[in-house]
Swiss-Prot record:
Species this chain originates from: Shewanella piezotolerans (strain WP3 / JCM 13877)
Gene Ontology CC: cytosol
Subcellular localization: Cytoplasm
Domain of life of the source: Bacteria
Catalysed reaction equations from the record: 8-amino-3,8-dideoxy-alpha-D-manno-octulosonate + CTP = CMP-8-amino-3,8-dideoxy-alpha-D-manno-oct-2-ulosonate + diphosphate
Presence of keyword Cytoplasm: yes
GO BP of this protein: lipopolysaccharide biosynthetic process
SUPFAM superfamilies on file: Nucleotide-diphospho-sugar transferases
EC number(s) from the headed UniProt entry: 2.7.7.90
Name recorded for this polypeptide: 8-amino-3,8-dideoxy-manno-octulosonate cytidylyltransferase
Cystine crosslinks: none
One annotated GO molecular function: 3-deoxy-manno-octulosonate cytidylyltransferase activity
Length: 245
């Protein structure tokens, strides 16, 4: 099975312009993401998918590969679809979508999501990661998307609210969604043609589109958190964690 990992990265960000190139311990953030991903076993290739020449130059500068995507891409999925079309991937090839703002991603988590497709061939077209929340402040923070899943680890729902809600107790595990996806090329093409979902639009969570249209999303629970960098303040947190990693 060919497995291509794509790291979508865009320069424009209302909260943090130029985020992929923000220096973390002397290297641009996108380099940390690329290098940590490259440690995962089972990958055929890794590319950064971007429409910005500054990001392209930075990635090629440290020896990484780039696929240039259209500046008209309306969503992350559109950028992924553009990239896989250019790369000429086969329908049953696996694509891992790792966000460019996760410099702390653990390669074992990437291996976990790949192994789901190896152990359950043909049972689903899309998979993602979850992590049990350990920080109290994350429970009710809408920035941290929560998820619930059934006994077979199929996602039931994703929400910015705390789910599930314990009516009589707060003593139960709550899981947050880690922004890593894997899917077959065929599923990406199917997903991109689906109309915007009502719940997707309410929560502003693209993955809900798959659930709303009856598609399974398999979940692997990671033992490693992968916090995203959303603001310049998050850089300092990453630097501290990388120093002891």
């Amino acid at each position: 099975m060919n497995v291509t990992l794509l790291i979508p990265a865009r320069y424009g960000s209302s909260r943090f312009p130029g985020k992929p190139l923000a220096p973390i311990n002397g290297k641009p953030m996108i380099q940390h993401v690329y290098e940590r991903a490259s440690l995962a076993k089972g990958l055929t290739d890794i590319y950064v998918a971007t429409d910005d020449d500054r990001i392209k130059d930075a990635v090629e500068g440290f020896g990484g590969k780039v696929v240039m995507t259209s500046a008209e891409a309306a969503s992350g999925t559109d950028r992924i679809e553009d990239a896989i079309t250019q790369l000429g991937l086969a329908e049953d090839d696996l694509v891992v979508n790792l966000q460019g703002d996760q410099p702390l991603i653990d390669p074992i988590s990437i291996e976990q999501i790949i192994s789901l497709f190896e152990r359950h061939p043909g049972e689903f077209g899309m998979a993602t990661l979850g992590f049990q929340i350990t920080e109290e402040e994350e429970l009710n923070d809408p920035k941290h998307v929560k998820l619930v899943f059934d006994n077979e680890f199929n996602a039931l729902y994703f929400s910015r609210a705390r789910i599930p809600f314990g009516r009589d107790t707060d003593d139960y595990p709550v899981y947050k969604h880690l922004g890593v996806y894997a899917y077959t090329r065929k599923f990406v093409q199917t997903f991109a043609k689906l109309p915007l979902g009502r719940l997707e639009d309410l929560e502003k969570l693209e993955q809900l589109r798959a659930l709303e249209h009856g598609h399974k999303i398999k979940v692997a629970i990671s033992a490693f958190d992968s916090p995203e960098v959303d603001t310049p303040e998050d850089i300092r947190i990453c630097e501290a964690r990388l120093a002891v990693d």
